[in-house]
Design a protein with these regions (language model features):
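Cell-envelope/extracellular polymer assembly enzymes that use nucleotide-activated donors
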Residues: 6-8, 37
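Short, acidic, metal-binding catalytic loop of nucleotide-sugar glycosyltransferases
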Residues: 25-35
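A conserved acidic beta->alpha catalytic loop
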Residues: 42-51
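Conserved donor nucleotide-binding strand/loop of the catalytic core
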Residues: 54, 58-73
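Glycine-rich, basic loop-to-helix element that forms the pyrophosphate-binding segment
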Residues: 69-86
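Short aromatic/hydrophobic "clamp" motif used to bind/position activated sugar donors
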Residues: 91
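Conserved donor NDP-sugar-binding/catalytic core segment of glycosyltransferases
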Residues: 99, 103-137
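A recurrent flexible, glycine/aromatic-enriched loop bordering the glycosyltransferase active site
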Residues: 135-151
Length: 151
């Protein structure tokens, strides 16, 4: 059994339901801290996201917030909204189209523990060359045939 989580997972989303489902499923399936708090902020969604969160929050142990804003706060505002509600030592922000791998959270946590000063740890995007731009900053290009089932 895993120890209590020092991390809260956070996603801010807008109209990205098919990928949001995969992101949430991958976090709960592949995280070391499977019981970590998980906050979702959904703003001005019209694609069924609000309803899906209402129907599936118990299954995935989600704390979710649905906002309808005349002036959208956007992803940055949504991340700040989530951060204000975190009570753990660390926050892991994810985009709603991320798919995480096994023990991804433990790897990041272990890396943070190597540093005594406040540290910012981030990941690289790993994808096939979908945009015909192999020099995209922060992107690691892999051959299409090795990428996996979600290509």
């Amino acid at each position: 059994m895993n120890q209590s989580s020092p991390i809260t997972f956070c996603i801010s989303t807008w109209n990205n339901l098919p990928y949001l489902k995969l992101a949430i499923q991958s976090v709960r399936k592949n995280s070391y801290y499977k019981d970590a708090p998980f906050i979702i902020h959904a703003e001005n969604c019209t694609d069924g996201t609000d309803e899906w969160l209402e129907q599936n929050s118990d299954q995935y142990d989600l704390t979710y917030f649905i906002e309808k804003n005349e002036i959208p706060a956007g992803i940055g505002g949504g991340m700040n909204f989530c951060a204000d509600r975190v009570t753990t030592d660390y926050i892991m922000f994810l985009h709603s189209d991320f798919y995480v791998t096994k023990d991804w959270d433990k790897s990041c946590y272990d890396e943070m523990q190597k540093h005594s000063e406040p540290t910012w740890v981030f990941s690289h995007r790993i994808e096939p060359n979908m945009f015909n731009s192999p020099q995209r900053p922060g992107t690691v290009i892999v051959p299409k045939d090795t990428f996996g089932a979600y290509y």
